[in-house]
Amino acid sequence: RGMWMPERVWEQSLTQNLAEAGIEYTVLDDFHFSSAGTTLDPLHGHFLTEDNGFVVNLFPGSERLRYLIPFGKPEQTIEHLRMIAEEEPDTVVVFGDDGEKFGTWPDTKEHVYDRGWLRQFFDMLSEQTGWLKTTTLADAVDHTPPQGTLYLPDASYREMTEWALPVERQQHLENLTDTFQNHSNWPRLRSFVRGGTWRNFKVKYPEANEMYARMMAISRRVEQAEEQGVAGTPLSAARKSLYRAQCNCSYWHGAFGGIYLPHLRNSVYQNLIDADRILDEAAGKTEPFIEASVDDYNFDARPEIRLGNDQLTCFLAPSSGGILYELDVRAISHNLLATLARRPEVYHPLVMQGETSAEEEVTSIHQRIVFKQKGLEQRLQYDARSRKSLIDHFLAKDTTLCDLARGDQTEHGDFATGPFLSRVRRNSDRIQVQMWKEGTAYGIPLKLTKGVTLSAGSPALKIAYLLEGLPLDRTVHFAVELNFAGLPAGNDDRYFHQEDRRLGPLETLLDLENIQEMGMIDEWLGIDVRWSANRPTHLWAHPVETVSQSESGFELVHQSVALLPHWIVEPDANGRWSVVMDVMLDVDPVSFTRTVAAELASH
């Protein structure tokens, strides 16, 4: 009869969806109700809400109880309930919150079970006779009248509306609350102070929008497959993978790791790629194929290009610097561009202050300050743009690897962002996406053309660059940024290699000269990412690591490996220069095992 709303997210149109599904009631936060402008204070009981003639009962869950249970002493909760009972003897007070608070969150098992909080709490509830009775939501709906009818604004719990704000606005809201929360008028004013809407996580974190847009495309594919007669196991398996990819944890960030956790993003993409592959097989696409399509795949009102075959799926954004923003390896259901940029967060000033003394008492998860590694304040670095591939840099000649790793490099061109023109060239077994832009570098007009070619049955991308209009009397420093996600650092079975020798684990900073090939192996994932070029190349590699907050504390998280081949470009007599690179994604078990064996034998 009732259901739990994930993250207590509410939009009024959900009323009809719930009612049509047979749902009679749900629990939201009292924050939702006060944001609607209700004059009832405190908020107890339940309310009716309606949409298109459909009616559902809504219970306001108490924020005060959310913070008392289980972090306050049991008697504090009893006294709070006693005060309410004295004012409203027959009212219903609702507590609804995460089960993780009772043993899963850090230190809560010891607090709730080992130190006896839960037993004390239940004993004290049982001891109260006459004035206090525990009940269910169903009984409350059946035996108590609604407080009235109310229409709620789009909302979630208070903290999530704050987390969804841009960092600057989030800080302003925190400052406002800190300034006025002890003011005598604050209880009357605070219902008019609220944050943003949860959907803006897709704006705050463009990577969340990428997952969301990809999920929506798969959702449409599942719907179309059903309309076209696909049924049975293929349809149910694809739908199951789609639903798994809709797990909300990966799409946002607050007091918990969320989108900052690579294994969550990887899991979303794994299930989306699984669904895509299942639907291809159901449609009879079992032989090598090649295809390309142009559509607004990320909901920015501009066209993106999907390039795919039986081995790989790529998404390119000509209007955003001509970047490659998704690269799916279908055999292992892995997106090598499930990256995350380094960006400011509202809690980073706390990180800058360094470690403080450990807390002795369990408090709300929202106020917990723990440093999981030393020196995190020195690891706060920010990116000017997304961490994707085919990002084109014109750099100062004295730019160093450390400059790149810190994000401190100076850009001397306008090719890393902005729109490129594009076209798709096709033949029977190969498709090339060409993108070009006439821009400037070092104040000089240049034309940059890049092409991405994929052939049927091939696990490799061929990437060609052509620079035109280069000055004959000077050289330029040109770099192409490639990022590879989901290859974790800090493990012996994930490493750089070149010509059958290891170059170090994936957190290694590499500054190599005059090379033409290098690889990255992840033995656990079962992939060898091999890069090569048709001319001698200087190459930088560095880890991309974020400092983020999770329920267990502040932590350093490896997000991706940045690979930057770079050249001091000397043009030909016509002011032209070119390079061709290959990115081979080898997941063949035989050749992969042979490569690993050769690596180990050499050591």
Predicted stretch roles:
Residues 1-23, 416, 443-461, 471-482, ...:
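Phosphate/nucleotide-binding catalytic core
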Residues 4-49, 104, 294-296, 308-310:
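Gly/Pro-rich turn-and-neighbor structural signature
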Residues 4-9, 22, 29-32, 60-65, ...:
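Short, flexible loop/turn elements at secondary-structure junctions
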Residues 13, 35-36, 67-69, 103-105, ...:
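Short helix/loop capping segments that flank catalytic or ligand/cofactor-binding pockets
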Residues 42-56, 60-64, 75-308, 312-321, ...:
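Active-site and substrate-binding clefts of carbohydrate-active enzymes
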Residues 310-423, 436:
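Acidic-aromatic substrate-binding/catalytic surfaces of carbohydrate-active enzymes
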Residues 409-449, 456-464, 468-471, 519-603:
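Beta-strand-rich recognition/accessory modules
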Residues 459-462, 468-539:
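Polysaccharide-binding surfaces and accessory modules of carbohydrate-active proteins
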